[in-house]
């Protein structure tokens, strides 16, 4: 399932060679689901062309070629902070742009009517130095952060998030955020339903499938030899009678 979502959603949304209605991406997965690792893989391939050959699924590797090495990537994880989402994003962008040799400073919040113009000006400065590259911003733990925000603060954060999603359509700027559950279905945000709906229009959600997590654990993290499987079976068999259908599912265990 995850390979299909990468091929059909993630890579097409990130690419900028073909005109498209590009949107921001939300990677949805609970703690331990591999959400952060998936974002790391996507952003690493986007940053370094040679890494795409390390993707074991041939179809995914082929589809990844449209973004491989095409981006300068900026990464951050939101922790305990009272900063607005705009201030967080602006701080990360300005710090990393300086490292890339791009001189750009965002105006203060009190000086802008909307943020799209500032993002467009930033990308114009970026493209002067890197005309063949896009800019990818990866933000983890977005949902936990939004849950800490007060009513008015949250509305401003969501409006900024919508603007970020909107500029992805016309610029070589891309945005990926990691959330623990589907942002648009979170009952805690029911009071800002209209703002959530407008954000939904400019973002694609990519859910990490449970069967893919199971496959990665079995085939990548904890792959076992036949001898190891035999020893585990011998150890577990005496306990099977205490756990429902464990006997029938022994191969999975």
Task: List the predicted regions and their residue ranges.
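N-terminal pre-Walker A segment at the start of P-loop NTPase domains
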Residues: 1-18
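Amphipathic alpha-helical segments of the small helical/lid subdomains adjacent to P-loop NTPase cores
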Residues: 186-253
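Short, surface-exposed basic-aromatic patches at helix termini and helix-loop junctions that form
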Residues: 45-48, 166-169, 190-200
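Segments forming glycine/polar-rich beta-alpha architectures that bind adenosine-containing cofactors
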Residues: 43, 177, 253
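P-loop NTPase nucleotide-binding core
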Residues: 21-139, 143-159, 186, 195
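Structural recognition of the conserved hydrophobic beta-strand(s) that form the central parallel beta-sheet
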Residues: 136-140, 166, 172-181, 185
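Substrate-engagement module of ASCE P-loop NTPases
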Residues: 121-129, 156-175, 199-202
